[in-house]
Amino acid sequence: MFEKEITIPAFFEPSAVAMLVQTASKFSSRISLVVEEKTANAKSIMGIISLNMQEGQTLTIVAEGDDAQMAILTMENFFTGV
């Protein structure tokens, strides 16, 4: 299992949720997003929306599986715009 904490950037808007799900869905690993003790499957649009992510909050990305390390890096890059 791999984890990475990031701060949700100002540019992350609800319209980016579909792109986030598409990015997460490229991996076979289970990817979860954790915000303020709420956890959601990163491959679920409704799950991500339920997190109600806001600029400046701490987000923990958790991945388990064969490609977990690459999934964490890719998800981090999605949020940081790298």
Q: Which residue ranges define each predicted feature?
A:
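Compact, glycine-rich, soluble single-domain proteins
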Residues: 5-41, 46, 50-51
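C-terminal structural segments of small proteins and small subunits
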Residues: 50-82
